[in-house]
Amino acid sequence: MFKFKQVIVVRKDLKLSKGKLAVQVAHGAVTAAFKAYKEKREWFEKWFHEGQKKVVVKVESLDELFKLKAEAEKLNLPTALIQDAGLTEIPPGTITVLAIGPGPSEIIDKVTGHLKLL
């Protein structure tokens, strides 16, 4: 069983293409992992050596994303909000995903455990 994980939360209201969605999720995963590497090195290393578990879940709105970010930050979890450059499908600066962690699974579950998988 994994003791550490990373969760990437996707906005479904944007109706992104599969390719665009995959890229946004990747941006979130890398950005949050880099932040954890700098700020929560022990969590990052344990997550990395366990196999780098990632889970992708969905929300229906930007407001939900902001609420989750605030909850995660209260628990001192690394987070990353991703804004699109706006070169293809959506306007510049559109927030597409929130990545949380890597961090202890039981802490991240307090924030995202109720969300449905993408």
Curated annotation (Swiss-Prot):
Location, primary (coarse class): cytoplasm
UniProt cross-references to InterPro entries, sorted A to Z: Pep_tRNA_hydro_II_dom_sf, Pept_tRNA_hydro_arch, PTH2
Subcellular location: Cytoplasm
Family matches, as Pfam families: PTH2
CC annotations in GO: cytosol
One example GO MF annotation: peptidyl-tRNA hydrolase activity
Catalytic reaction equation(s): an N-acyl-L-alpha-aminoacyl-tRNA + H2O = an N-acyl-L-amino acid + a tRNA + H(+)
EC number: 3.1.1.29
Keywords on record: Cytoplasm, Hydrolase
GO BP field: translation
Family: Belongs to the PTH2 family.
Function: The natural substrate for this enzyme may be peptidyl-tRNAs which drop off the ribosome during protein synthesis.
Protein name: Peptidyl-tRNA hydrolase
Source organism: Pyrococcus abyssi (strain GE5 / Orsay)
Lineage of the species this protein comes from: Archaea, Methanobacteriati, Methanobacteriota, Thermococci, Thermococcales
